Amino acid sequence: MTFSVDKVRADFPVLSREVNGLPLAYLDSAASAQKPSQVIDSEAEFYRHGYAAVHRGIHTLSAQATEKMENVRKRASLFINARSAEELVFVRGTTEGINLVANSWGNSNVRAGDNIIISQMEHHANIVPWQMLCARVGAELRVIPLNPDGTLQLETLPTLFDEKTRLLAITHVSNVLGTENPLAEMITLAHQHGAKVLVDGAQAVMHHPVHVQALDCDFYVFSGHKLYGPTGIGILYVKEALLQEMPPWEGGGSMIATVSLSEGTTWTKAPWRFEAGTPNTGGIIGLGAALEYVSALGLNSIAEYEQNLMHYALSQLESVPDLTLYGPQNRLGVIAFNLGKHHAYDVGSFLDNYGIAVRTGHHCAMPLMAYYNVPAMCRASLAMYNTHEEVDRLVTGLQRIHRLLG
């Protein structure tokens, strides 16, 4: 199937609107992607004509809603090439997925004197849960340092592992730098030391195919809203044998086998024992539509288009005076930058006046900001619906801001 950005854009209603009297150039998909009509319509249709509580209902609407929900689990397992749909837990998003692992697997397997390895480029969602776990149990948090070019100092990684290392928690793609980490060699090294590996895939799954079996990671987590799906829904993948050993994190309905006031409670099997309470069924339906939409376009075709657009953007940005780019030349999805000595908020505000939406701030990556000794950065992210013309508008806008602010 030939990729057509014009056809893709026609599926996204918001891209036809104007901001400040100018066509919207939405360059903030790394924060949250826009939604195609297919996703919006699927969720609306469910609420209009198919809504019911899932599980245990004997009536038609409940049975159909349950079947739709479980079909999305199957579709998601195929999307990331898992061995079984029962290795996937529905979560609110990447943050909840990581916290689930920290509070279930982590509380059961990490002890005083143990250590966990993360990197200096992590999103706070892959830092704070491990800090909290280490504080609870008396474990140590070790950090893979950054290089100035935005890659990790991988030569230090073997020195961080020892017999007390329980987990490597690493991002697949940096949400600030666009760096894609060499997961295969990192996962192999971790397993050689008996450690498990969690991969934060929030910034990866929309840009190219992911094969969790080939990666051999123990945990992989991502959000739906960055993948053109709804907010409030995501996927946590856990190897089946590992998942069946993990205790539940939250208690309530749907995750039990039996409840007795005198004899206590027993749990249902995984993955359902990690899905306490009424699920976000509408969000799950929308996620399924997003997976179907992206799969129909073809992730390889999307990757080819986006990489060509990224190369064009990096080339054109070289013409902007006093522009500092952060991250490696080979990157996925995002371009972080600062313009001269001007604060990122000021630059972002000017760009918004030109109808261009970028993200400004620390991007939930304060340790990374500290490494580069800046309080904030601007970040333009490129998605499958962005165009060369929008890149040109970004470049022209930055050139104009430089002239205005000096």
UniProtKB/Swiss-Prot annotation:
Q: Where is the active site?
A: C364 (cysteine persulfide intermediate)
Q: Can you cite an annotated GO cellular component?
A: cytoplasm
Domain of life (superkingdom): Bacteria
Q: Which SUPFAM superfamilies match?
A: PLP-dependent transferases (SSF53383)
Keyword annotations for this protein? Cytoplasm, Lyase, Pyridoxal phosphate, Transferase
Catalytic activity, per the record? (sulfur carrier)-H + L-cysteine = (sulfur carrier)-SH + L-alanine; L-selenocysteine + AH2 = hydrogenselenide + L-alanine + A + H(+)
Q: Which InterPro entries match?
A: Aminotrans_V_dom (IPR000192), Aminotrans_V_PyrdxlP_BS (IPR020578), Cys_dSase_SufS (IPR010970), PyrdxlP-dep_Trfase (IPR015424), PyrdxlP-dep_Trfase_major (IPR015421), PyrdxlP-dep_Trfase_small (IPR015422)
Its localization reads: Cytoplasm
- Protein name per UniProt: Cysteine desulfurase
Q: Which organism is it from?
A: Escherichia coli O139:H28 (strain E24377A / ETEC)
